[in-house]
Amino acid sequence: MNHIALFEPRIHFNTGNIARTCAATNTVLHLIEPFGFEISDKHLKRAGLDYWDKVNIVYHKNLQDFMNSIADGGQLYLVSKFAEHVYSDVDYSDDKKDHYFLFGREDTGLPEEFMHEHRDECIRIPMNDEHVRSLNLSNCACMIVYEALKQQEFRGLELVHTYEKDKLK
């Protein structure tokens, strides 16, 4: 199973987009406190997150709480622009294994000491950083979870939809 973990997310729109991706891909969403926004019915409705109840969300009080929750045999990946390993070069094909993709705060990323402790688990998305400091968090989460799903042959997802008024027929 795939898991996306957000360390102290600051921007509710990113978290909402990632939650939608998780709902669409049967991916577990881990939210690590504190947040830079309020999670309440009022705020969720205003953001149009009417699918929030369809997302498997696990809340964690802090990073250590999240680390303690990783299933035996689970694989942790820290997503960072500072990593050496490219995300698409990693083997995620075992869909029986728990793959945890941990993303840092939008403004400061993951704690540096924590990254050093897990240097071998760090992965990156290649980019030209001469002109751009970083990629959007929700885009990154989507890219990485879909790479994992591609390698897992999209098991558990519908590959073809049938609609009453199919625009392609």
Swiss-Prot record:
The keyword S-adenosyl-L-methionine applies. It catalyses: cytidine(34) in tRNA + S-adenosyl-L-methionine = 2'-O-methylcytidine(34) in tRNA + S-adenosyl-L-homocysteine + H(+); 5-carboxymethylaminomethyluridine(34) in tRNA(Leu) + S-adenosyl-L-methionine = 5-carboxymethylaminomethyl-2'-O-methyluridine(34) in tRNA(Leu) + S-adenosyl-L-homocysteine + H(+). Its EC number is 2.1.1.207. It is found in: Cytoplasm. One of its GO terms (molecular function) is tRNA (5-carboxymethylaminomethyluridine(34)-2'-O)-methyltransferase activity. S-adenosyl-L-methionine binds at residues 79, 104, 125, 134. Keywords: Cytoplasm, Methyltransferase, S-adenosyl-L-methionine, Transferase, tRNA processing. SUPFAM superfamilies: alpha/beta knot (SSF75217). Belongs to the class IV-like SAM-binding methyltransferase superfamily. RNA methyltransferase TrmH family. TrmL subfamily. PANTHER family: TRNA (CYTIDINE(34)-2'-O)-METHYLTRANSFERASE. This is Putative tRNA (cytidine(34)-2'-O)-methyltransferase. It comes from Lactococcus lactis subsp. cremoris (strain MG1363). The lineage of its organism: Bacteria, Bacillati, Bacillota, Bacilli, Lactobacillales.
